[in-house]
Amino acid sequence: MKSNKTMEKKMKMSKCIKGIKETPIDLQFKEATARVVYQQYEDVLLNLALVSFNEQRTVLSTMDGLQKVRNVGNVYVPDPLSKRHMTLQSYDQFTQDLPITLGLCHSDFIFLSTGVNMECVAVCEKTYGNFHVCCIATGGARDNALRMGVDAGNWVENKTQMQLSSGTINIILLTNATLTCGAMARAIMTATEAKSAALQDLGYMSTFLPQVQATGTGTDSMIVVSGVNPDVVVKHTGGHTKMGELIGFTAKTAVTEALKKFDNM
């Protein structure tokens, strides 16, 4: 339990810059700064977990692929905004306009989207030797949990309209180690397995087929951010590796906490 003095200090650190209110997210990971940013977009107040670095980082995103950027984020899109922009065409426009609204360069910022408020964000960090892994997650799975390989999909790209559900499990993984492209891809697999383990431990069942265990939601996404330390290079992030263990532990812990916060599990 955090003391009142700690909470007061956090509140004092909240600030307004050019009309944007920011509340810091405490990280032991010193290579990045993280905060929840509140921003008016059109006539709706949204918020996002924004993680920034001093230099460009190689990142692998399930939304944008392999990129080099200084900023990554997880954006809460409230329902009124979701109804306007969560179709394929209008979402592309949203991804172009939001960085401008935030005062960020579009080419230096990639983000995920969710119907989960960033006030329900969860963080887990773990170290081993010279490895440091940090997971920042949000999660909601009451409305669109599914079991992959069992549940049916109903959206056909370019033919039918897709709407963002109020759930979604989004993960941002940070590490100080320089990850190869293969290690970043395997990290997504490792963290996804950990996410499914969190759902299993919490007893989530498919929303559409309640008799089967859920493995995720239909809109989950992830960003993996590589470190830049040339002396700490990691090629393998599977479950038998120490780096894989750190990724799995932090992802499972953060996702579990995030789901408890938003879904009251």
Residue ranges of model-derived segments:
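Alpha/propeptide regions of enzymes that mature by internal proteolysis
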Residues: 2, 7-265
